[in-house]
Amino acid sequence: LDGRISSEQGASWPVCGEIDIMEMIGAENEDLNGKSNKKVYQTLHAGSATDVDHSKSISTYTLPEGIFNDDYHIFGLNWSKNKMEFYVDNKIVGSIDYSNNEEYKRCFNRPQYIQMNLATGGNWAGDAGDNLAGQKYEIDYVYYGQNAQQKADSKEYYENAIKINGEHDVTMTEGETPNLLEGVTS
């Protein structure tokens, strides 16, 4: 694959933007340096990876009773052009209006990919320990929907997005180097 992707359509992390609807850094049964199984974070990432301000915490929500591991919970995002509202169990826990932030508008007023993963350890979370066997990450369902305004904004984005023309199937034969972009224009 030719690596010359239009910068209008692709970029590396965090320039491309990342919306974390739910992040949890667990601790067994107690609050450990601000980390526990009672607390979740909602975070945006945008800008250069060398920019120390590429992460913006939108909110932190702590369960009033119990821990998140006790039952299923609903984590959500109501995402409209220039605004996001994050919710936990149908309660809005944080929001951001980024209508005056050009970098956020460039990152977040466009489609994003959805990814659900269980990550352990790292710079933020610290050492995950040695007892990771048998861990579970259970998801009951995922729902995606749009209201009329969100549909209109999506349609406007795609109408103005760069179009790729001339795409075609290519047969790869060992020893040959085909021009993968032959006849392709934007």
Q: What do these predicted regions represent?
A:
Residues E159-T185:
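Solvent-exposed, low-complexity, repeat-rich "mucin-like" stalks and linkers
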Residues L1, T185-S186:
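Accessible peptide chain termini
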